[in-house]
Each structure stands twice: as C-alpha cells, then as structure tokens.
From Swiss-Prot:
Gene field: bioD
Protein's name in the database: ATP-dependent dethiobiotin synthetase BioD
Lineage: Bacteria, Pseudomonadati, Pseudomonadota, Gammaproteobacteria, Enterobacterales
Main location class: cytoplasm
Subunit comment: Homodimer.
Catalytic reactions on record: (7R,8S)-7,8-diammoniononanoate + CO2 + ATP = (4R,5S)-dethiobiotin + ADP + phosphate + 3 H(+)
Residues noted as binding substrate in the record, renumbered to the chain: 42
Entry-linked HAMAP family: BioD (MF_00336)
Length: 224
C-alpha cells in the first residue's frame, strides 16, 4: 500500500524541511521506499541545470530512492517570496495538474511519499487555487509541524480547524523546538495536547548543528 503525506506548518520557517527529512529517514529505517517531493519552492541557488532550492536538496538527500532535481522540485523560483506572486511577475503559471503529474511520477517509484508545502495551510498557488485545494484533490493525509514559540498555540488550533473544515484527514502533529529549550517549552506542548485533537507524533529537539543529527534517538512516530 502506498502512503502519501503532506507536510504543512503553522507558519513559515517552522522547520518543515528538517522534520520532513527526519520522517523520511524514519520511514526508510522501517523498510519503506521513501521519496520527498517539494512541488513548488521559492528562494534558490544557481546550479548548472538552473536554480534549485536548499529545502528540495535536503529532501532529495533524505529519500531512499534516487530522484533527479526536477523530480523532487519541478517548479522552483529563485527569489524568496510567495510562489503565486513570483508566478505572476515571471509569467510562470503554477497549475495543479503539473503538481499532480510530478506526484504520480514519484508514486511509480516509491511507496512512502512526503510532500512538503510552502508556508502555511492556505498558501496560494495562484489567484484561485491554494495548496489546500490540491491536497484535497489528491486525498493526501496532512501532518502539521508546530514550531514551539510565542503564538504557536493559536496558529496550531486554527490550522487544525481549517484542515478538518476542508474535510481532509489530519494524520498528526509534531512539536519542533526551533529555539534552545526554556522553562516554558513543555507547557506549550501540554497546552497543545489539550487542544489539538489529531494524533501527537512526538517532539523534535533543538539542534545546534543540523548536519549532525542522530535520527535513531529522535522519538517521533510515523503517521498512519
């Protein structure tokens, strides 16, 4: 059975990619053929083949199957701004059909796929479509990444309510410590446990060096 998940966040810069890489590694260790997919990205670097996004590079490295840059990230914008705005200025339309084509291609090679969105749940793809409408179309199970910081509780509750109101399955949430641990961190998480109804998958600790992560020691569960 092929498992397909969509990673969203309560905000931008909540650590979606690092958590995605951990989930991909965990799924690989559980015996799955894994693939990370970032259909749309903004903010990149020059490569001989064009522009490529650092988040997409990490997803590619964290996948167990071999994927090309284009397979992981078919739509990449060099500047760091909302994709629908860059799409308008660069006259490069973002169509849901193109996102689906890339996903279908990866599905032929992998049985555990993690799709990373951009920003939060209602990030626009165009003037009429959002990532959420595409996720609903593809019937993906959503995982919420919550960065533990001031404001995260309200953002998390709103995000889960939006997903449920869109009649999409929320497979769980992960607390990501993006700042060094302080005395209130566990109180944030305890409050989230009281309010968020979706399964709690675990906590990602704060990392000083994200290039030296012991994946086996991170106690997060794979979504069902």
């Amino acid at each position: 059975m092929i498992k397909k998940f969509f990673i969203t966040g309560t905000d931008t810069n909540v650590g979606k990619t690092i958590v995605s890489s951990i989930l991909l590694k965990k799924a690989t260790m559980s015996g799955y053929q894994t693939a990370g997919y970032k259909p749309v990205s903004s903010g990149g670097q020059k490569k001989s083949s064009g522009f490529f996004n650092q988040d997409a590079i990490l997803l590619k490295k964290s996948s167990s199957i071999i994927l090309s840059d284009r397979e992981v990230n078919p739509i990449a914008f060099f500047e760091n701004a909302p994709p629908h705005i860059l799409s308008k200025f660069q006259k490069r339309s973002i169509k849901k059909e193109e996102l689906s084509l890339g996903l279908n291609n990866i599905t032929k090679k992998s049985n555990w796929i993690l799709v990373e969105g951009a920003g939060g749940w209602y990030t626009p793809l165009s003037c009429k479509d959002t990532f959420s409408s595409w996720v609903k179309q593809e019937k993906l199970t959503v995982i919420i990444i919550i960065a533990i910081k001031l404001g995260c509780i309200n953002h998390a509750i709103l995000t889960e309510k939006a997903i449920i109101s869109d009649q999409i399955k929320c497979g769980g949430w992960i607390a990501n410590n993006i700042f060094p641990k302080d005395k209130y961190n566990m109180h944030y998480i305890q409050t989230l446990l009281n309010y968020i109804k979706s399964p709690f998958l675990g906590v990602v600790p704060y990392f000083k060096n994200k290039n030296r992560i012991n994946f086996k020691k991170i106690k997060i569960k794979l979504p069902k």
